């Protein structure tokens, strides 16, 4: 908070809270995946599992596209969403933050299919290792950017980069 500043941290929290509403688009599909995966696996139906994986990847990629479309509408109407309480530079920062957070969220939707698949295969060590690495790398990458004055945009850029790396890691692991 000291490196970011109270005003910029407040702006980050404000933008994050608005963008987080888009996470409701997932509609709890992850639990459904685990349910149907368990059913197909109990029946030794590998074809059913393959179709399930394809269907859920398609569903979550579609949700990502919807997220990006809704996010684009939000970015274009940023002044309407936040009203007149921000300065011009805060609007500019909020716009970049919103774009990055929307991309980050859009990446998490397809990643949830891979996370569910890894959970269904009970490969918890891999997931815990990724979480540990993310928690280790996040401050080591974010802190220098904050010290260099990149602010909340640098912080969210690191988060988005790490989300992308997690997605790629999960894809290759699956």
Describe the function of each predicted region:
Residues 1-9, 79-86, 146-150:
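Helix-terminus/linker motif at the lipid-water interface of multi-pass membrane proteins
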Residues 1-23, 52, 152-157:
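Interfacial/gating helices of multi-pass transporter permease domains
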Residues 103-133, 150-153, 174:
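Membrane-interface junctions at transmembrane-helix termini in multi-pass inner-membrane proteins
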Residues 13, 46-62, 70, 94-95:
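Interfacial transmembrane-helix starts/ends
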Residues 13-41, 57-67, 105-111, 165-169:
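Small-residue-rich midsections of specific transmembrane alpha-helices
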Residues 128-174:
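Hydrophobic alpha-helical transmembrane segments
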Residues 73, 86-111, 128, 132-137, ...:
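Alpha-helical transmembrane segments of multi-pass membrane proteins
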Residues 68-88:
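Short membrane-interface helical motifs at transmembrane helix boundaries
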């Amino acid at each position: 908070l000291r490196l970011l500043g109270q005003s910029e941290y407040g702006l980050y929290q404000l933008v994050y809270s608005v963008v987080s509403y888009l996470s409701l688009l997932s509609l709890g599909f992850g639990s459904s995946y685990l349910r149907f995966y368990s059913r197909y696996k109990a029946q030794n139906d590998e074809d059913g599992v393959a179709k399930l994986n394809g269907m859920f990847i398609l569903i979550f990629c579609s949700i990502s596209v919807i997220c990006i479309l809704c996010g684009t509408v939000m970015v274009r109407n940023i002044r309407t969403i936040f009203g007149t309480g921000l300065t011009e530079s805060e609007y500019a920062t909020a716009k970049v933050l919103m774009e990055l957070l929307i991309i980050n969220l859009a990446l998490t939707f397809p990643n949830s299919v891979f996370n569910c698949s890894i959970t269904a295969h009970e490969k918890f060590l891999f997931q815990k290792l990724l979480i540990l690495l993310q928690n280790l790398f996040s401050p080591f990458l974010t802190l220098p950017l904050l010290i260099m004055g990149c602010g909340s945009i640098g912080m969210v850029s690191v988060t988005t980069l790490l989300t992308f790396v997690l997605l790629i890691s999960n894809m290759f692991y699956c």
